[in-house]
Each structure stands twice: as structure tokens, then as C-alpha cells.
Amino acid sequence: MPSTHAPTGLRLLFALSLFLLTGSMTELSAQAFDWVPKDEEIKKYRQSWNPFSEGPLLIQSVDIHPAGQLSVRPFFFSQISEKSYGNQLSLPTDRKDGPVHTYSISPLVTVTYGLTNHLELGAATSLISFWSKDTASANAGRGGPWTTDTGMGDFSLVLKYRPIVQDPESARPSVTLYQQIVLPTSRWTGTERPPGGFAPLGRLPATRFGELGFTEGLTFRKNSNPFRISGGIYYTYSAPGSDAGQTTYVGDTINTRLIFEHFLDDKRGLAYNIELVTVHTTTWRADGHGINRGARSGSTVVGIEPAIQFKFTDSLVGAVGVLFTIAGQNAADAIYPNFSIQWYWNKTGKVQMR
């Protein structure tokens, strides 16, 4: 029989995490909110070079909305995977067939809102459809059997706090603290786990599909005409799960991002991006438990995405790109075509670039 303690433990862990999330912000308010950008610094940044555009595809914006501004961002992400990497970190020249061919699409919608000039709240939800077939059958050209499912993905809540805003007259970048809770709505609604077990790479840090997760991140951005450079590192802890009455433990996850934007036309928001992405599952857990599920020797994916961003109107922007796997270990080799649009709204009637 399944343990009756696991659900209670998960509820307690979730409640504790919410308490720590809100408590940490309260503590910052009481002790560290003296370390915030001054109004003059924010005004100086807002008046500096920063073209209105979509920005990077594969990282949440480091700088945050001004108070009272909102954006809605539909993001369409797809995956084509027919090869895989072995137990050693290797290049595409060493990739192998199998074990499965996987094709998936995953629309994601993110809504973000500026609570203050220092805090931004976000929420994201997604759908996923995937089709998977064993490699031997696929290579032989035989029909079926396919494993396929369509359903709801996971739901994320994101809180960002920016203690440092960049100075256009010095090398100082913006620095933002990133906190995310992933609720396993895919599991709650019965969506089957896709091969590999990860939510697709994309806008948010990759997490384990269908599992309660807690992410802490540190991000930065610096604008220097005609370039914008941003990046971040994120650590995700997955709560213990349960399978056939056994408590399951998977490795924690580390995501990194490094993005270069080069603007060709400021007024049109036209730029090209080079976006570097890595996802690494660890051989340890923050709670000290041994790993009994997933890639016990760890896994790594390194990808690079060329992208183009553009402006449609003074409140609507978009971007399109393709993410290519350039190295991997115990992971799928895949390409990920993707595109997004983003609509801005401001209570003053005039939107501002973050």
C-alpha cells in the first residue's frame, strides 16, 4: 500500500517553502531593503539606451517591470529527438541511436506584473503533446506502437527581486534574485510523463516533469549600445516522490543561461541573439537522501540557440529561434524550434522596456 506519510510530507514541505519564500521577503523588508536601488538610479536606468523588444527567448527578463506594468507572453516550444548521448559528456559526432524517437510541442503562457519597482510576480502554465516510438521500430520504418499523450503541463509561480539596477555610466549590471515554485499540475491532471522526464527546455529553468520543485536563481544583465548581455544560474530541488509505495528521490537540477543580443535597428526592435543553455542533473540532493530514480550518474545537456527578435507595435514584440544540442551526457540529442510573442500593458498607457 502507498505510504500515508508521503502526501502529508509533501504538503508540509510545500507549506514550509511558501513560508520561507514569504518569510525571506519579510526579512529582506525588515533588514535588507535598505539595499535597494534609489529612485534616482532607477530613473537613470529607465532613461538609458534599452530598445523596446522581445529580448532573449530562453531566460526570464533580469530587469523587472515598473510598478503597475504587465506583460503576457505566449511561447511555443517544440522538440525533435532521434539520437542520444551515452554516459560520457560528448559531442554530436559521438551521439547514438535511441533509445526512442520523440517529437513534442509545448505551448507555454507566462504572465508577469510589476508589484513595485523592485519586485515582480509571475505565473506560467503550459500544455504538452508528445509522440514517442522505440528507435529500432522507427529506423525499420514499421508502424507503431507509438506512445503519445496530450495534457496539461506544470504550473509555476515566480517572484523576482532586483537589489541592484545597472548603471549606464559604469560596468555595474542589474542583479536579480529569482525564486520559483513548480506545482505538479501535469501529474494531478493525469498527463503522462514524456521520455526523459523533464519539462521541455525553454523560457523557465528546466525542471522534472510532474514533480514539486523549488528553484533559487541569481541573474544579471548589462546594456551597452548596441549589445545586451544577460545570464543566470538556477538550482532546483525536487521534493521526494512516491512510486508503488516506495519513496523516490531524484537528483537536483542546475540550469545556466548566457545570452548575447546585438541590435541592428533600435526603432524596430530588430536584433539577433546567441543564447547558450545548460541543464545538469546532479548525483546528490540538497536533503542528503540517496538517489533511487532517474540518471543516478547524472546528466548534462549543452545547447546553443540563434534567434531573431523584432517589434510589431509599441506594445507587441516577438522572437523566433532554434535551439541545437551541442553536447550531452545521459540525455537526448535534439533540436528545439521555438517562437514567442509578448504583449505589454501599463496603467499609465505607455509601456516601458524592462
For the regions a language model picked out, list residue spans one by one.
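Short loop/turn motifs that connect adjacent beta-strands in outer-membrane beta-barrel proteins
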Residues: 31-33, 60-69, 101, 118, ...
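Hydrophobic, lipid-facing positions within transmembrane beta-strands of outer-membrane proteins
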Residues: 55-57, 68-70, 105-109, 153-159, ...
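Outer membrane beta-barrel transmembrane domains
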Residues: 85-89, 93, 244-354
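Detector for outer-membrane/organellar transmembrane beta-barrel domains
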Residues: 68-80, 198-199, 203-291, 343
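Residue-level signature of outer-membrane beta-barrel architecture
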Residues: 63-65, 113, 125, 161-163, ...
